[in-house]
Regions:
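C-terminal flanking tails of non-heme Fe-dependent oxygenases
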Residues: 1-181
C-alpha cells in the first residue's frame, strides 16, 4: 500500500466517524495530497545535564506518518500536562493528527502535542511523512460540521505551513492564531 492510499483510507474513516460523507476531507484537500518527508538523526548526548528535548509542538500537516527508531524510545506525547513515552514498535507506523486536520474537523480531532527526547548513549533515527492539502489550497472547518450550536472555531486559511513556520519559533502555538475571535 502506498502513502496516498493509506492516507486517503484513514481520512475517509475519520469522515465516517463524524457521520460525514466518506470523501469530505478528500474534497477539502482539493484532490491534491502534498507529502513532505524528512530524515531525523539524533546524536547521542554524553552528558545527562546537556540532554535537550525538542520543543513541544504539533505538526502543521493534516496527518503525519512516522517510522521511528526500531530500538530506542524518544518520542513523547503530552496529555493533560503529563508526558507519555511512545513505545518502541519495530516496523509500526505511528499516525499523528496535525493542525490542518484539527482545523478541518472544527476542533473535533485534536493535533497531537509531542516532543523528542534524545538518548544519552546512542544515536536515534526517525522518518516522518507530513501529509496534507497542497500549500496553495485554502482549508477551513468542513461546512457539515458547522451548526448554530457548534459554530466555526477556526478561520479558513491558505498556506497554513507559512503561518506555522512564522509562529512556531516564537513559542506561540500556530493554530491559536487562526482561531475565531
Amino acid at each position: 500500500m502506498n502513502v496516498k492510499t493509506l492516507h486517503d483510507k484513514l481520512i475517509q474513516y475519520m469522515a465516517r466517524c463524524l457521520n460525514l460523507e466518506e470523501n469530505s476531507f478528500v474534497e477539502e484537500y482539493g484532490g491534491t495530497l502534498q507529502v513532505i518527508s524528512r530524515f531525523n538523526f539524533y546524536i547521542p548526548c554524553l552528558y545527562i545535564d546537556q540532554i535537550r528535548t525538542s520543543s513541544k509542538h504539533a505538526d502543521s500537516a493534516a496527518m503525519t506518518f512516522l517510522l521511528q527508531d526500531k530500538e530506542l524510545e524518544g518520542l513523547e506525547f503530552e496529555k493533560d500536562n503529563e508526558w507519555f513515552k511512545a513505545p518502541v514498535l519495530p516496523h509500526a507506523i505511528f499516525v499523528n493528527v496535525g493542525d490542518q486536520m484539527e482545523i478541518m474537523s472544527n476542533g473535533i480531532f485534536k493535533s497531537a502535542i509531542h516532543r523528542v527526547v534524545p538518548n544519552p548513549e546512542k544515536e536515534r533515527i526517525s522518518l516522518p511523512l507530513f501529509c496534507g492539502p497542497a500549500q496553495h489550497k485554502e482549508i477551513g472547518p468542513l461546512k457539515a460540521l458547522i451548526t448554530k450550536d457548534q459554530p466555526a472555531i477556526y478561520k479558513s486559511v491558505k498556506n497554513y505551513n507559512e503561518i506555522f513556520f512564522r509562529y512556531h519559533p516564537t513559542g506561540i502555538r500556530p493554530i491559536t492564531t487562526v482561531k475565531m475571535t
